[in-house]
Swiss-Prot record:
PROSITE patterns: PDZ (PS50106)
InterPro entries recorded: EBP50_C, NHER, NHERF-1/NHERF-2, PDZ, PDZ_sf
Biased composition regions of type Polar residues, renumbered to the chain: 255-264
Organism annotation: Oryctolagus cuniculus (Rabbit)
Membrane topology: Peripheral membrane protein
Keywords: Cell membrane, Membrane, Nucleus, Phosphoprotein, Repeat
Domain PDZ: 11-91, 151-231
Listed name of the protein: Na(+)/H(+) exchange regulatory cofactor NHE-RF2
Residues that bear Phosphoserine: S130, S183, S254, S282
Amino acid sequence: MAAPEPLRPRLCRLVRGEQGYGFHLHGEKGRRGQFIRRVEPGSPAEAAALRAGDRLVEVNGVNVEGETHHQVVQRIKAVEGETRLLVVDKETDEELRRRQLTCTEDMAQRGLPPAHDPWEPKPDWARAGSLSSDAGQKDVNGPPRELRPRLCHLRKGPQGYGFNLHSDKSRPGQYIRSVDPGSPAAHSGLCAQDRLIEVNGQNVEGLRHAEVVARIKAKEDEARLLLVDPETDEYFKRLRVTPTEEHVEGPLPSPITNGTSPAQDASAWKRDPFQESGLHLSPTAAEAKEKARATRVNKRAPQMDWNRKREIFSNF
């Protein structure tokens, strides 16, 4: 009995035929990403070993896992007459997710690393283990990784900086949606899912998407971005501390032990609901009740200005 074929991504090179590539791409409700729905018999897609149910990871070397259906289609059409697709079947996809591995073209050639390989690559947002109680995260075969913000210096190339910035309606802030391989953004250490904290030394957490874009474009050919990956973001939020450039190499905030940390107290003071009016006081029970009532009355969000829809995504 033949041994089962090892799990690995597949790199499919398609040359367009008279009837196109011969496959159907679609998104699935409840699942992230784009999937191959159907492959036409005798088509270039079938000849390239594309299969129904495959999940699309890269198009022509660019990761598209976080992109919309329309954006993925445009990337496929960008190179006329041919395309290169990195895909994974369901079993390979599940194994990559279980081991928290980032799918790459190299894996299509060499296969997945051994399950117990201490050098197994992991994305910045998925280091082994869970958040520890301090500012580092234990790795089974190495020292703890300190959860620090990253300061990325970018110089604009002929095609721009090479990253896509977007806002997520489910959470505040601006996030790196995708980074083009080989771009200035990639070389400077930007990663997909990073949250943007500062632009050129100025905090932008409370700004609208268009305002953040304007800050990035303020300097014509360069930008200095302070970012946090999801783990670091969660750590600083737990401590209620705003990341700054000082945290890149300087002392990190102390973890919470046996109660509230000083950082928590300071942050709680800063978030006093009366601070904006100049009164640094805690509300009385009656004031809190009135504030809650007013919030319920005015909780309906203002109608969206559809002329500003383009603020949601920006390419650099």
